[in-house]
Amino acid sequence: MEKEEIKESFDILLTACCTQDDKLGIAYKQMRDLLERLCRSQMPNESLQMTDLSARISFVAARIELSIAEQNRLHTFRLTSNAVLNRREVPQREKLLRDAKTIAFFLKKLSGTDIPETLYRLLPKADATYIVAPLAHKQVERMRVCFQYSDEFFLY
């Protein structure tokens, strides 16, 4: 991807994040068009004809080795934008910012370019779906058990 194209993509996300509440539907349309363009740019010479965005996301995700969580976030955006664009769901700023963060990190992975600071400051900081640390498993060392009687296999 060219630097100008990357900058333009980040600018689209920045504009979407700064959109007024009554224009969030338009912002979703712009973000969805951006995601489609990014996916198509990663498969220009493919003879594979993929008409739906879901297939293109999965293809590109496999090609650039996105984690399952990253793929799920892209598909979550796709489903949310479908609902908003088909007027089954009212667009919400929190979801729009979550989805802008998803696309920004996808673009960062595609281009190797850092997210501009002005955009990064607008994105949500804490999001349970972005936790990268593995879950901690604490081993139980001692346990107190109360029981009335026992047999060979169980405590009652």
Task: List the predicted regions and their residue ranges.
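Amphipathic alpha-helical interface elements
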Residues: M1-Y156
